[in-house]
């Protein structure tokens, strides 16, 4: 990182750096993937900066990811979330008011809200977004996630939706990037299947997108996985949009190249590893 900063002139900071006088939680990591350009355009999603994200590493087959760009004052939450992480653990805080978008909301703009989920806020915004959407779903819930290790609250919400007749579909990778975590994902998938949730696999390889579509009306895109770490340990960013056009596009994209999951879970291994799910 130091070499990159010196070569490019980009200011870089290590988040929650572990050192001799390290005080932060070792599991509290910045998992957000976001960018704000000139305070006008924001980007969120699952895309990191790495070879696999640009199709140059095919060990997991095709690596599918997702993201969303948008403009307007809603990007301010991304800017605020960035500086929350940028200043984490520091006494002196950066002043970021000059980076904020001052434009008036568009009169014909759809409903769009940026959310930041952080362990420092006491409540998991990510978990609340999932539970609120799923508990209020009337017809369908379609989710893509690379890791399926939700807490009991989200698991119960998914099962309850399926029980009341909502078509609940979750797409997981066909080829894993981490075999140990995948064993837990398969174990959870088996349990959710028994409770009426339709679990599918991305046929072409590894799906890293964290997208959701509900009732063909609401869409969510961001960095948060459907797992314990993203919900309670990591800093995450995402965007909620009320738009039938966008929601249907997201739903089609999630289900594209997805096939029914028929594989058996990793037996005792998966069940035992689930005990360590919060640390995975």
Summary of predicted features, one role per range:
Residues 1-280:
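Charged, low-complexity intrinsically disordered terminal segments
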